[in-house]
Amino acid sequence: MKITNPVLKGFNPDPSICRAGEDYYMAVSTFEWFPGVQIYHSKDLIHWRLAARPLQKTSQLDMKGNPDSGGVWAPCLSYADGQFWLIYSDIKVVDGPFKDGHNYLVTADAVDGEWSDPVRLNSSGFDPSLFHDPSGKKYVLNMLWDHREKHHSFAGIALQEYSVSEKKLVGERKVIFKGTPIKLTEAPHLYYINDVYYLLTAEGGTRYEHAATIARSSRIDGPYEVHPDNPILTAFHAPSHPLQKCGHASIVQTHTNEWYLAHLTGRPIHSSKESIFQQRGWCPLGRETAIQKLEWKDGWPYVVGGKEGLLEVEAPAMSVKEFSPTYHIVDEFKDSSLNRHFQTLRIPFTDQIGSVTENPHHLRLYGQESLTSKFTQAFVARRWQSFYFEAETAVSFFPKNFQQAAGLVNYYNTENWTALQVTYDDALGRILELSVCENLAFSQPLIKKIIIPDEIPYVYLKVTVQRETYTYSYSFDQQEWEKIDVPLESTHLSDDFIRGGGFFTGAFVGMQCQDTSGERLPADFKYFRYEETTE
């Protein structure tokens, strides 16, 4: 059997992999999307299912007002002492000389069980991880952020002991690794293998220069010797390789005594409008997760098949275990809670923004703030996970003024999105409006307004994504569809387009209701269909 990469498609970056018996788990970053952290489960490293979203409460994660691409960065999941340990950052500032953020620890007996309230650890840098030393001690590592003028912001990897009984860091903080000439050293994971400490880090930034570096030492606090063929993982030297941005990795030893590395990757698409300065492409699916096999030579791990990684990887020698789908193609909102694959922005899904029970078999969203808000949006969405798909919904919405709108949205962040919405025109009544926001440049490109007949209870909305472009359509009866002849660029919903590539999520599609008049006018969505297609 083969592992086919990426194993986690769509926005699923910064994988932290661990094993509990014969079960395998990966935690990935969620940034400003709520609930915080996604944990996937596998029995064979081939098939993965979304098993849990552990940070469900605002006592664990309060992101209201967080910036775009703030929130949960680089969680680290581990299993020790009969329980799961999850450590994560909540980043409050992403621009400028400071990187304000706080690092927390939560625990649970099972990944899909109740997670504890958080222990606040420190705020000295991001990408924290927890290491369980064979001595019984526990240590927290994180990159150290230095805001000072004439100092490099990435000041190295810091190590400090954590007291389980006192629930706090104790002893001296020590920088144990300053990184390599690749620079931008972050994402530390520490392993103890055959009496040697191995420190795995990410370097080079999280764009196309991304890489994974490994170093080793006989002592936990160093000094650390760098791998003789470092970096052990990168695709920067191979611009035509289908897996790009390879880096930010973690390691697991299987119960069959094989070694694998989970890592971040991106799959770029190219556009006819591409300039000579953008030769690497765009990744609208965001940063995804792939798995590579490792082999050991002279006490060092190497990626089998080359340091850029493979699309198909030899699977471990264990029984294959497939899972039933956790997301149905059509969701008719028959359950008492949202499907796990849906998320909201910054805040939990509560009756402040919506309900799946108030109008049976509907998702009701109460009009809140606009798509540019970092506070209270009524927006329920899921990831783009394919370059070719359709998403469709039906909305019942009767606005009374132009500040009320509801519909289908494709979204990257508050500065980059498109929306086909039912809204109101003073002269025409209910209409459909297409809105486009690209790096905060706002436009409404429809020349002729689409009038909705008074007797129509539901307006059907659809988006068709075909690799580098996507288009909206609408119908008043779900039979006859009218395509809106405004092709939109998928590349504009990618890390690589957003203000020059400084952000970290991926494209989402979903349902939204806004009422900037403050009346909270509700919209009822009858279903949501997400279906992957072929070229």
Swiss-Prot record:
It comes from the Bacteria. Coiled coil: none annotated. Its EC number is 3.2.1.37. The active site is at residues 14, 186. Transmembrane segments: none annotated. One of its GO terms (molecular function) is xylan 1,4-beta-xylosidase activity. Signal peptide: none annotated. InterPro entries: ConA-like_dom_sf, GH43_C2, Glyco_hydro_43, Glyco_hydro_beta-prop_sf, Glycosyl_Hydrlase_43. The keyword Iron-sulfur does not apply. The record marks 127 as: Important for catalytic activity, responsible for pKa modulation of the active site Glu and correct orientation of both the proton donor and substrate. It is an enzyme of class 3 (hydrolase). Keywords: Carbohydrate metabolism, Glycosidase, Hydrolase, Polysaccharide degradation, Xylan degradation. Beta-xylosidase is an intracellular xylan-degrading enzyme. Oligomer; homotetramer or homotrimer. This is Beta-xylosidase.
